[in-house]
Amino acid sequence: MDWELYLNYFGDIMPLTLLVGIIYGIVIHYKNKDTYRWRKICSVLFVCYITALIQLVLFLDIMRGFSYLLIHHMDSGNINGYFHFSGAYNFNVNFWSHIDSEKIGNIIIFLPFGILYPLHSEKISYKRTLLMGFLLTSSIEILQPFIDRSFDLNDIILNTAGVFISATVFFVIKKLILNGKIEYA
């Protein structure tokens, strides 16, 4: 997949992502008065990330259709007949056969999860972050055949690798800061 295409997709998913983020931000601002401001900001960013991720990997055709409708005031044809089972699946683990932008994208798209998930709550551990990242990517892959996309075991492995990389870096830096090895301004 081309990087320019990802940037176009970004524009398609932003309206709903921002709307969900604003509504969630207002709710947690009034609901959790004693929570630190930076924790609230991290929670809003996490919710925005999850909203964007779900739109991008599960509902991109629908979101592109709505985006087209908003801009051009006409149906793009992307929404009709969307929900049906494709039956496409791939259980072959072959992500090293050739590295392309789609495989790199599968890692990159889950890098924010390993950082934002533990930042939105104090009590989230490294193991829990990895587990939740794996469960999220597995759930997304399991749902894909129901929306005319394919299940691919490589995606689960690469997405989980993205969570592993970012969570490892995050928790190592966090431990160094807490032990006084790195000064935090």
Residues of each region from the PLM?
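Loop-to-transmembrane alpha-helix initiation sites
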Residues: 151, 155-157
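Bulky hydrophobic segments
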Residues: 1-150, 167-185
